[in-house]
Design a protein with these regions (language model features):
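N-terminal Rossmann NAD(P)H-binding glycine-rich loop of SDR-like oxidoreductase domains
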Residues: 15, 23
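Amphipathic alpha-helical dimer-interface segment in Rossmann-like NAD(P)H-dependent oxidoreductases
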Residues: 70, 102-120, 160-161
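Catalytic loop of short-chain dehydrogenase/reductase
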Residues: 125-151, 156-157, 161-164
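C-terminal helical subdomain
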Residues: 165-173, 189-225
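Rossmann-fold scaffold of SDR-type NAD(P)-dependent oxidoreductases
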Residues: 12, 73-81, 103, 128, ...
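Active-site loop of short-chain dehydrogenase/reductase
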Residues: 7, 73, 87, 118-131, ...
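Catalytic Tyr-X3-Lys loop
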Residues: 82, 89-108, 123, 127, ...
Length: 225
């Protein structure tokens, strides 16, 4: 198991299926958590795992940046996001704005919130969750989703290249399939065809503990089939 004792990690999307698994894994590894989420989902997360602080914030709002800057963290794990499909010829500007806001703007605001402290202490890690479609650079029936998740990957990798000399690293996580969640099971997906969220959480914790000269900048995580 990864050892994250003495580390403070900000986890966004608290209460979601993946974030719940990540939160438990990080706590088990000894990390202190700052949970960021909204409403009932955030409350569920607060009830399930101990957290140093709990922030009910809308990360699509630029005002969230200043609130996040009040908190000193060693790593950011960003799981906020949305999925959507539509025929390319039926997509609207609102569809584009909504998808980019959910997947890219929220990440940008979270990063802008935590980055000043990371740069000051000359150490930090930013983990962003992308998608299989972005890894393949193709998503039939989900062009806007694919583009927004590709933006996530490009942003995090660019941050890594720009800031690694200042102690701040980046890692992109690509779930190369659906994650095992109640929603996906209700949709008829079988457990063996989906990714174990706790296993994915363990992979993220592993990435967070890599030494400076052995970075993991991209993780592709697959189900069994």
């Amino acid at each position: 198991m990864a050892n994250l004792s003495g580390t403070t990690i900000m986890l966004t999307g608290a209460g979601g299926a993946l974030a719940t698994a990540v939160a438990q894994e990080l706590v088990d590894a000894g990390a202190e958590l700052i949970l960021v989420g909204r409403g009932e989902s955030l409350k569920r997360a607060e009830d399930r795992v101990p957290a140093t602080e709990v922030l009910d914030l809308d990360l699509s709002d630029p005002a969230s940046i200043e609130e996040l800057r009040r908190h000193k963290v060693d790593a950011l794990v960003h799981t906020v996001g949305a999925y959507g499909m539509q025929d390319a010829h039926k997509a609207t500007p609102d569809d584009l704005n909504g998808m980019m806001t959910a997947n890219m703007t929220t990440l940008f605001h979270a990063v802008q919130g935590v980055l000043p402290h990371m740069l000051k202490q000359k150490e930090g890690m930013i983990v962003g969750v992308s998608a299989a479609q972005a890894a393949r650079m193709s998503g039939k029936g989900a062009a806007l989703y694919t583009a927004s998740k590709a933006a996530v990957a490009a942003y995090v990798l660019s941050l890594h290249d720009e800031l690694k000399g200042k102690g701040v690293r980046g890692c992109v996580v690509y779930p190369m399939g659906a994650i095992d969640t109640p929603t996906n099971r209700e949709a008829g997906m079988t457990w063996e065809a989906t990714i174990d969220p706790r296993g994915m959480a363990q992979s993220i914790a592993h990435a967070l503990t890599r030494p400076p000269r052995a970075h993991l900048t991209e993780l592709k995580i697959y189900p069994d089939v």
